[in-house]
């Protein structure tokens, strides 16, 4: 038996969960049923099965969190859909969808996977992308969604420390909302310099989902353009900003590429807690003892200044990793 949108019983008849607990506990060993339930509201599904105060706590034999396509699969999809694709097209698919099958399928069923076609398909009248972020998250947040949306909008725009976010929201205290966005909703994560201690105050917040990040940065921020159906104007803004925005996402792409290679024991960025100085885009510690990679990420290799990265790595080595041997690289579009 398969039950989809299992969390909806909260809105219909919450006692269903207690009834199911009694039936399951009584007949589980006697029956030959494989019961599968699924749901799209992360926080409620977590509550149902992982909150020890809920009747179905501990009853799930297996919990599967559906993941996005990995980078190898995205490349295969690109080759099948657009054999002449460029790495910039691949980066755009990653930037806009994060590999979420639903969004990738929408693109593949309707267009050729190129930057311009993807932007035109997303930003048009009656596009399913226009309200997708709102529809996904209002169900999670409920009627008090406004503050959460303001926080996510700030983070998507590069305001990523708690004091900066609170200042952007008029000095509103947001500690509780930040905690829930991390622990209950699984939407943002804390980023600390690599090897920083858990209690370190050098924290930046980041939206995990590529599409949600993109949606807040453009669809939510430029809602006024959508309301007057100025889709041409919004397309122009996205295209003009694409080199800068995709450059940020290229760093995320390479971190994922490092992770999927299974050759590293820790992957992150590094910066000094005070002043964000000597920042290194990617620091990856290899499985081999005292071996690491330090990478500067640039869309174009011609913009790379090796002497700057060398100075930053020496600073990191002296401060944190004195015994490490570093491989210094520049990663660009051509390395995807």
Regions found by a protein language model. Give the residues of each.
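Phosphate-binding site recognition
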Residues: 1-232, 236
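A cross-kingdom feature that marks ATP-driven nucleic-acid transaction machinery
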Residues: 201-336
